[in-house]
Amino acid sequence: MYLFILFLACFCASTSSIFAKLSDLPSIILLAYRLAITLIMLAPYTLIFQRNEFKKLNRTLVIKTALSGVCFAFHLLSFFEALRFAGVAEVNILVCMEVLFIEVFELLILKKCISANGWIFLLLSCVAAYFVISGGKSDAASAEFPNALLGKGLAVLAALFSAIYTLLGRDVRKYLSMPVYTTLLYTCSLIVTLIFIAVQKVPMFGYDSRNFLYSAGLAFFATILGHNLFSFSLKHFKSSMVSSVKLTGPVFSSILAWICFGMVPSIQVMIASVAMIFTIYGYIQCEKD
């Protein structure tokens, strides 16, 4: 049952690319709508049933949660922007580099030891990532995504921000439950997003009403049934298991993109993506809990 929930979370999270592609909102507005609708769904439960937990908050937890929220906002913004310039498959597979960034941070900051086999898989995954980034240069691909390299760069940036907010959140989650942590996380992210909107003077309203449905889909499927169920799954599986199953996300995203938009990545990207998934999986198994 719990394994089904884990795969369901992965599938729901993969719908993020589809809803983002369907929407014609500016990325910053799409992000604001997604966060606001998510909070409308999540905050009432947290404030009614978990409000006593807010007493556990101290200065350190507040700072870490705020920083995590900032990184989460930049992660989603980079992800949405990447989808405007590159294909769904390439963007999602490159976001999987989050696992590699986490390991690099732990190696540099926590002085984590990596086995010889782990280093081999780590280096191979970087090679595969290079071929994903450099792929898709055919005439057809260039015509559809003339700035694909920019999109892939933004996808790598999204992976970096994801790694940072994951590491910060992992510490905070030791003291706060999932509803309280995610409510605080999304609140901080929304505040940062609204500040950017105000500074850039981007209109909040006046867009096609169907964009509201896409934003609601992002909030419910990708966030509530996606990211939140991942956090729930960590109570029943080791983090290595959750990370391994999350690697199926690009597969789900690519299938949905093919069904919805007829998007098919180049042969090089497909081969490099499969190689990257297996090398990251191999690394996770070498370094698992």
Task: Explain the meaning of each model-derived region.
Residues 1-32, 67-70, 74, 78, ...:
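Glycine-/small-residue-enriched transmembrane alpha-helix faces in small-molecule transporters
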Residues 4-5, 29-48, 120-127, 150-157, ...:
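Hydrophobic alpha-helical transmembrane segments of multi-pass integral membrane proteins
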Residues 12-25, 30, 37, 77-86, ...:
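Juxtamembrane C-cap of transmembrane helices in multi-pass membrane transport proteins
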Residues 42, 114-137, 247, 256, ...:
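Hydrophobic transmembrane alpha-helices of multi-pass small-molecule transport proteins
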Residues 45-46, 98-123, 251-271:
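C-terminal transmembrane-helix exit sites in multi-pass transporters
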Residues 49-90, 94, 131, 219-237:
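Specific transmembrane alpha-helical segments of multi-pass solute transporters/efflux pumps
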Residues 91-97, 168-190, 223-259:
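Helix-helix packing/entry segments at the starts of transmembrane helices
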